Structures are given as C-alpha cells and as structure tokens.
C-alpha cells in the first residue's frame, strides 16, 4: 500500500509533464504526495490507473476527469511499486481506500 494526497496528474509520458492541482480530461493516471502544501513534482508519485477488469474500480474512483472532487483527497492505494513515468511509481492499482484526515 502507498498513501498520499491526490495532487494532480501527468499529461504525457514523463513526470516532466506533471500538472499539479489541476483536474484532467485523462483517466490514465494521478499524482500523489505526502501533503498538499509546498508540493514539488519531485515530491510526487505517479499512479497508473489501468483499464483491466482487476483495476477498473480504482480507475473509475480515482481519475480526476470523472472525479474532480478527489483532488486533495487522501487515499491509500494497493499496487506494484515500480518505475512509471521515468520515476518510482505505482502500477496495477487494484484496491483503494479514502483516508480521513
């Protein structure tokens, strides 16, 4: 499990295309960070939101295109920690829980 605040998304194939504190028309990924204050791209972990049957519930619940109200929400996500978008990230997110502050 990884835990953090949803702080944006990546608009491309590299963390260099990160968009902080913006909603998205994309459903493919989100960025999470330890807090919502003084966030830099280097503080973020990209999370892949896959389309497979094991992952679609997480994608539908967390993507910022369909859920702009989830920006700045705290969440725990279960997936595979691996390189994604050129940095350490999370792929195959298959479970999630929203966390109260």
Go through the PLM ranges and name each one:
Residues 1-101:
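OB-fold single-stranded nucleic acid-binding module
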């Amino acid at each position: 499990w990884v835990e953090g605040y949803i702080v944006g998304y990546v608009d491309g194939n590299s963390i260099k295309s990160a968009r902080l504190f913006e909603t998205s028309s994309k459903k493919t990924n989100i960025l999470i960070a330890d807090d919502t204050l003084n966030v830099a791209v280097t503080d973020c972990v990209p999370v892949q939101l896959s389309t497979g049957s094991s992952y679609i519930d997480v994608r539908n619940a967390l993507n910022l295109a369909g859920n702009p109200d989830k920006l700045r929400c705290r969440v725990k996500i279960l997936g595979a920690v691996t390189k994604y978008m050129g940095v350490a990230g999370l792929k195959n997110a298959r479970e999630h829980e929203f966390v109260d502050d």
